[in-house]
From Swiss-Prot:
Family matches, as CDD domains: Maf
One MF term in the entry's GO annotations: UTP diphosphatase activity
Domain of life according to the entry: Bacteria
Organism, as annotated: Lawsonia intracellularis (strain PHE/MN1-00)
Cell compartments where the protein resides: Cytoplasm
Gene Ontology process terms (BP): nucleotide metabolic process
Protein name (record): dTTP/UTP pyrophosphatase
Active-site residues, Swiss-Prot/TrEMBL: D81
InterPro entries named in the record: ITPase-like_fam, Maf-like
Its biological purpose: Nucleoside triphosphate pyrophosphatase that hydrolyzes dTTP and UTP. May have a dual role in cell division arrest and in preventing the incorporation of modified nucleotides into cellular nucleic acids.
A Pfam family of this chain: Maf
Cofactor(s) the record lists: a divalent metal cation
Annotated site residue numbers, Important for substrate specificity: R24, T82, Q175
Amino acid sequence: MTQQRVSSVFIETVPIVLASASPRRRSLLEQLGLLFKIVSVDSEPLPLSSEHPLEYVIRAAKVKAFAAAALEPRSVIIAADTVVIYTKDDVFEIIGKPQSGNDSFSMLSRFQGGKHQVITGCCIVWPLEENITSVQYEIFYDTASIQFGQWDKDILSSYVSTGESNDKAGAFSIQGIGAFLIDIIEGNYTTILGLPLPQLVKRLLKRKAIKVVLNKNSEETISSDFLTYSR
């Protein structure tokens, strides 16, 4: 499907590839007004037994990004991975996507009344340039937390029956029907959706992969050299 550019603060200067089939990540990039290509890669690794959640999301994002970069070497590749961390008695567990409706119900039941962390790791692979043979990439991550409310089992069961939880980390969608499950959010909303936009945009601007639109009618742009970035 051909993308139509919408009114935007930014415009891309090089081809951009999103290495994800996630509708949430696609929607977030589209909201920026950028045109990009989606390359879905079947390269998501499983967590290792002794691997910290942060190490895992960074590794998973890097694996996805490098797989897409092999297919699109002249593009900026954006890849990400998100996990929900269930913590009890100082022991953490990585909660991925449910395998069944029963699995979804079990996850949501465990979350009730608790505060849990969401981690999104990202990897950007920059386009190969002449006389540069090594891959240039950048890793970053962001965390947020969510406080679940207390809900009756029949409500959770009804939510699971909608099918919305099927492909969501933690078995809920904060952007959809499942928003009612959450009492409190701490941190950036886009991190929970799977793509931390503030950190991503700053890096794309710094490497001049996108520019700021100064005059939306003429698409005149201002160089990112004139902008100040927070580290």
